[in-house]
């Protein structure tokens, strides 16, 4: 069975650390390993695949037998010493462009950009390039190097004379005046493709999304109308009917969101990620995660692997409007037959990348006193998982003991201690309370509302923020108040929380109180379709009479 049929959906963009103060053209790390070169084909029978999981956003230069620069065209899988080689999906910059951002893509199972990350590139005065490379979210990924054609001083190849070079079609002369770099035709009008353009060495090709095929012109796409055409685009079974067709999966696999691809079931929860691999797909292989001490356990029908966002080598990153947790399940032959009697294997290796996505933006509502049930807020992402926060009312400024058993009576001029608490503590993430406002009813769209925090700024001078050891937790103190009117005896709080990567110095969380940025950046976040859900607790009657 092709490994591509086992892939869960992946789209990962890695957050970079802040750039170094020194000019990266003179402060870089050389990558000179011969196996990085695009000509080096990986042989699984002789070696283990390599991975660049040691990288952490430093600047690098390709030298020696690794090559001159990153390739700007799709590299087939099982090259550059690994399963999923990484190439630069975009042209190299000119020296006057300074530092630019480009997309880096990893090729795997026929998909030239199954994973992607953002890297930074700079053209240096001496004719070479340096790259600020992010750590891959999963293994096995390696950044590739490539030897580009050079027009030498003796005027061999396509040289016009001893001082001027002419490059072959599909390439252009680099900043050193000698090297011919591949042109990315996809950067110009998407290469003429109606949907997907894939840049190749000295050329390009068009492709279509799932369930669609190229027309005879090789550029435009059309819907697959039945199982007779490319199996309906289905990864496994295609069933035709008078109304059309539908894809079906074998027992143990589930249909993904594209309604065409079958994948291993993955359950995304904030407390744990659960992967369940059908036993017949495993055979005599032993399954483990990036941290090989985390291994699968068989229940007879499935091999199950359960891990958290903080264990087993799981990588957590912020990608646009999502928190993305990634790991990879690897299957290798057992050294001895297992207890289930496996004495043969049907595949030499199994790779199942796993990704869970959680939304970044949450809206939490609570009365002055939590409901006695104290149910946590669980916000469901559009497709994949939940990441819970609670709005707690604490007994004092230590913010260690929230009210649990009894509802206190709060009086005017008392201090109200409240905070945003994550139910899962994950390193590498932080939160920003974008707004907190009070209403006399549980409705968030109540016309009568009073803001304590707005645009990440404390809007009431009586509100005090306390520091917290956890980047995701936020603690505040405010005087107890009520709304004017004898009928207004209850107060509800509503807080809007955004989650970001700690190392992303350009994130909304890092900017903190900044109303202008809130209008510009926040509107983009809202337009991205962030989902929120309201949990309402309380209310409590305020003892406001002397």
Curated annotation (Swiss-Prot):
Main localisation, per the record? nucleus
Q: What's one GO-annotated cellular component?
A: nuclear envelope
Give the GO molecular function terms: calcium ion binding
Glycosylation sites noted in the Swiss-Prot or TrEMBL record = 89, 116, 299
Q: Where is the ZP domain?
A: 261-516
As for subcellular location, the record says: Nucleus envelope
Q: Signal peptide position in this chain?
A: 1-19
Tissue-specific expression: Liver-specific. Expressed only in the hepatocytes.
Tell me one GO biological process term.
Answer: renal system process
Entry function? May be involved in hepatocellular function and development.
Write down the PANTHER family for this protein, in alphabetical order: ENDOGLIN/TGF-BETA RECEPTOR TYPE III, ONCOPROTEIN-INDUCED TRANSCRIPT 3 PROTEIN
> Which named protein is this?
Oncoprotein-induced transcript 3 protein
């Amino acid at each position: 069975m092709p490994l591509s049929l086992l892939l869960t959906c992946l789209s990962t963009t890695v957050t970079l650390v802040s750039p170094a103060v020194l000019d990266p053209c003179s402060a870089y790390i050389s990558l000179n390993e011969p196996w990085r070169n695009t000509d080096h084909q990986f042989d699984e029978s002789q070696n283990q695949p390599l991975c660049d999981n040691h990288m952490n956003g430093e600047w690098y230069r390709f030298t020696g037998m690794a090559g001159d620069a990153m390739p700007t065209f799709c590299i087939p899988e099982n090259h550059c010493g690994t399963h999923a080689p990484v190439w630069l999906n975009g042209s190299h910059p000119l020296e006057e462009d300074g530092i630019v951002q480009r997309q880096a893509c990893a090729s795997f199972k026929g998909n030239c950009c199954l994973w992607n990350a953002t890297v930074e590139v700079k053209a240096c005065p001496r004719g070479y390039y340096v790259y600020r490379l992010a750590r891959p979210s999963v293994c096995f990924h390696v950044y590739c190097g490539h030897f580009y054609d050079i027009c030498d001083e003796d005027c061999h190849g396509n040289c016009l004379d001893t001082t001027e070079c002419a490059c072959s079609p599909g390439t252009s002369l680099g900043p050193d005046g000698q090297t011919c770099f591949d042109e990315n035709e996809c950067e110009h009008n998407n290469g003429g493709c109606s949907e997907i353009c894939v840049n190749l060495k000295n050329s390009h090709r068009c492709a279509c999304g799932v369930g669609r095929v190229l027309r005879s012109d090789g550029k435009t796409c059309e819907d697959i109308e039945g199982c007779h055409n490319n199996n309906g685009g289905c990864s496994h079974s295609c069933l035709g009917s008078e109304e059309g067709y539908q894809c079906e999966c074998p027992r143990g696999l589930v249909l993904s969101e594209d309604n065409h691809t079958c994948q291993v079931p993955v359950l995304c929860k904030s407390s744990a990620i659960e992967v369940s691999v059908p036993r017949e797909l495993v055979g005599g292989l032993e399954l483990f995660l990036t941290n090989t001490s985390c291994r699968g356990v068989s229940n007879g029908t499935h091999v199950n692997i359960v891990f958290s966002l903080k264990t087993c080598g799981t990588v957590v990153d912020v990608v646009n409007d999502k928190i993305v947790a990634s790991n990879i399940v690897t299957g290798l032959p057992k050294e001895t037959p297992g207890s289930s009697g496996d004495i043969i294997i049907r595949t030499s290796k199994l790779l199942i990348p796993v990704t869970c996505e959680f939304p970044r933006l949450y809206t939490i509502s609570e009365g002055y006193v939590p409901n006695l049930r104290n149910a946590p807020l669980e916000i469901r992402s559009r497709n994949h998982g939940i990441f819970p926060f609670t709005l707690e009312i604490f007994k004092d400024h230590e913010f260690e003991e929230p009210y649990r058993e009894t509802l206190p009576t709060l009086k005017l001029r008392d201090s109200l201690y409240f905070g945003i608490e994550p139910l899962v503590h994950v390193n590498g993430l932080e939160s920003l309370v974008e707004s907190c406002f009070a209403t006399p009813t549980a409705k968030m769209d109540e016309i009568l509302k009073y803001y304590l925090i707005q645009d990440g700024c404390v809007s009431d001078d009586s509100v005090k923020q306390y520091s917290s050891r956890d980047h995701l937790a936020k603690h505040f103190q405010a005087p107890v108040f009520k709304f004017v009117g004898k009928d207004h005896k209850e107060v509800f709080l509503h807080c809007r929380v955004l989650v970001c990567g700690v190392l992303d110095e350009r994130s909304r969380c890092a900017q903190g109180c900044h109303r202008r940025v809130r209008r510009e950046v926040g509107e983009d976040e809202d337009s991205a379709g962030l989902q929120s859900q309201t949990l309402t607790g309380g209310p409590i009657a305020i003892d406001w009479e002397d």
